[in-house]
């Protein structure tokens, strides 16, 4: 009986030692992206992409800085519109009806501030940010067997209240990169539904791997795909690029 108990205990220890932990998965993910030193050397990213809308190919330019400032510029029918803009204090975007820039409400701006440290990936320095990880049972999604991680970030504001900010990441077990991210929509007409972001076509740019295709959709629904054409890093930008016009 003692021998049987020892064998069972040994098998259990072997299983534990060989099992992946959430931290192991993130370490391999960061390494596969290019390594922490390389990622930390990046101060800015500019992506140029196109999205198909009603048969039209719409150009998009997205600029993000390590300090959290960001802006997306959309060219449509001869006009340029800004969306998702944040200058470190104010978040704003173009009103599609009036075609004039408008500041976002205080709640939206506060949520932008809270996620402004997620430059490149929320997983970079996640412990310093106070994020926590939980490894869940493996799942197959988009036809790929994946590690599933529950990522709890800083609380977000919804309808004036702090609520949990939880995302579920599905990491390809072979390449250790996320192929799907899911989150519950916290407010608005689609409150309670699950949003999905699907990543594919990872390519190397200056030693760092990026997904060159990204589809945003509701779970089990149709979505909008952005196809990236070029990515540049460490360009310098004037403060005015991100500022609300007139300030």
Tell where the protein language model's regions lie, with residue ranges.
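Short Pro/Gly-enriched beta-strand edge/turn motifs at strand-loop
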Residues: 45, 115-120, 182-183, 196-197
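A generic structural signal for short beta-strands and their flanking turns/coil linkers
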Residues: 43, 68, 129, 165-167, ...
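Gly/Pro-enriched, hydrophobic low-complexity segments
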Residues: 19, 77, 142-244
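A short, sequence-level motif marking secondary-structure junctions
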Residues: 62-69, 87-89, 108-109, 201-203, ...
